[in-house]
Amino acid sequence: ELKGEPCVSIDTNPSPKKNICTSRSFGVKVTEIQSLKESISSHAARCAEKLREQKGCARYISVIIKTNPFNKLDDYYCGYKTINFNVPTNDTMDIVGAAETLLDSIYKKGLVYKKSGVIVGDIIPQNQIQLNMFETDQNRIKRDSLNSAVDLINQSIGRNTVHIGSQGIAKVWQLKQEKLSPCYTTKWGDLLRVRC
């Protein structure tokens, strides 16, 4: 603002995204494919959730895994692969399944990974999907209602209350959150204890 005149207008209705990326650096050294699968599954499920929020479907998915580029003791590796979906989708099962398949093809044993991510792109509105001749509308309706129910539960109770098993439970790979504020209203362990 200059002299009460707005210089930049605020866009209250942003246009839908063409690509969605979810990625995180690991809080610990990750070498096992199981930990990578948990992180990739979590990122893929979050991408699917974001797609449904904007009522879109993705035509392709990419998976990326990286080692630490600043570690001079180890070789740098960046694995990246993309595949197209037969039919554009926002279904969590389809997206997670494709992401895990891509991870299996780019994973190299013996490396210490620092970061993983999932990108879905070429997003179109979900009401403009053209089905192939082998997919029935009934299957899509069942999966859509399942995804809607899971999204509703997660929105009302909390993120990842209901999730795919491949996302894991412990999530030791997650980013360190040492300075996180306590959640007094949502976590029993964070409640204040008073002693008399």
Per-range role (PLM):
Residues 79, 86-196:
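Acidic, metal-coordinating catalytic segment for phosphate/diphosphate chemistry
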Residues 1-110:
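DNA-contacting surface of Y-family translesion DNA polymerases
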